[in-house]
Amino acid sequence: MSATNINCVESVRIGSHVLLGAGCLITDSNHHSLDWRTRCLEGDTDKKSAPVVIEDYVFVGAKSIILKGVTIGEKSIIQAGSVVVHDIPAHCIAGGNPCKVIKYLKQAL
């Protein structure tokens, strides 16, 4: 995990044997309101969050972004530079912006 940034308001769970490439961002919240009045004048206390779960044996490529509410299934691979906004199933290769399944991997017996 090199220069990876994990922002956690409520819950980020990273399983066993997970590899995170350099410069990844993992966040379980939107950080702040999009309304400038709320951010600047009223004080931003309404952070919306949803848990992030990265299951066992996942590989996340460099500079990928994993946003709130996402679960990445076990033994999946996320290509470098991907933006993960939806759940990714187990045993697949996924990538892109937004991240989509590219190929399913054969499961070992």
Label each region the model flagged.
Residues 1-66, 105-106:
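Flexible, glycine/small-residue-enriched loop-and-beta-strand segment within the central core
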Residues 69-99:
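C-terminal/domain-terminus segments
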Residues 98-109:
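Short, basic/aromatic-enriched C-terminal tail that caps enzymatic domains
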